[in-house]
Amino acid sequence: MKNSLTDYRLYHGAWVYCGRPDTEQRLTKKQAKALLAEGGLFVRNIYDFDCQEETSFWMIVKDHFDDIPQLKTSIRTTIRKSLKTYDFKRIPSLPEFVELAYPVYREAMLNYKVKAIPDSKEKFMADCASRTNGEYWVGVERQTGEPAVIAVNQVYEDMCEEVVLKTRPKFMHNSTYPTNGLLYEMYRYYLQERGVNMLCIGARSLTEHSNIQHYVIH
């Protein structure tokens, strides 16, 4: 099976694959050049999803749910604190999600060490709407009702891929761990309640450069 160039989308300067992460194939130089001729800075091409040997770049996949008692003590503490502080919920309406999520997305983008220009609200909504079977999550601080963390997931028949995860900067260093709580709730929902076989939750390389939470790895 070969990729079609229509399977790629331009996202913040990078061409990224839109299909299931386990179906992406290696692009030829000609295909990569054809994409770059349409704009963008680089092509992200992740192939050999389940190769036999260890490489310097790998996807993080979770295939079972660990309830709180099964986790390390330090992780249990962060999740319990998060669940006491925030309400985590799946939002069925895209317009409602965008109203809650866009301020979180914008502030998170502006807070990156390598400055990134946030998309407009309209473009953010269009990007969310373009996701195949997209599902939307928000974590809201109970005391104030303020959105603290958001996620957009792309759901397939037997797997779920996390494609967006953003946390409002002011909630990242107040010891309430909104991201850990949201991840825990999503893992419970998809792996235990929905019964998907696996969640694909990002990539990591030997350079340790990743936005994946410590909780996910450990």
Each predicted region: which residue ranges?
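Acidic-and-aromatic substrate-binding clefts and catalytic sites of carbohydrate-active enzymes
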Residues: T23-R26, E96, A203-H209
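Conserved acetyl-CoA pyrophosphate-binding loop and the N-cap/start of the following alpha-helix
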Residues: H173-E185
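A conserved short alpha-helix in the GNAT/GCN5 acetyltransferase fold that borders
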Residues: A32-L36, L183-Q192
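Conserved active-site alpha-helix within GNAT-family acetyltransferase domains
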Residues: Q52-S56, L206-H218
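N-terminal accessory interaction module
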Residues: M1-D48
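A conserved beta-strand-loop-helix scaffold within acyl/acetyltransferase catalytic domains
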Residues: M1-L10, N45-Q52, V61-S175, Y189-L191
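Conserved GNAT acetyl-CoA-binding A-motif
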Residues: G39-Y47, L191-R204
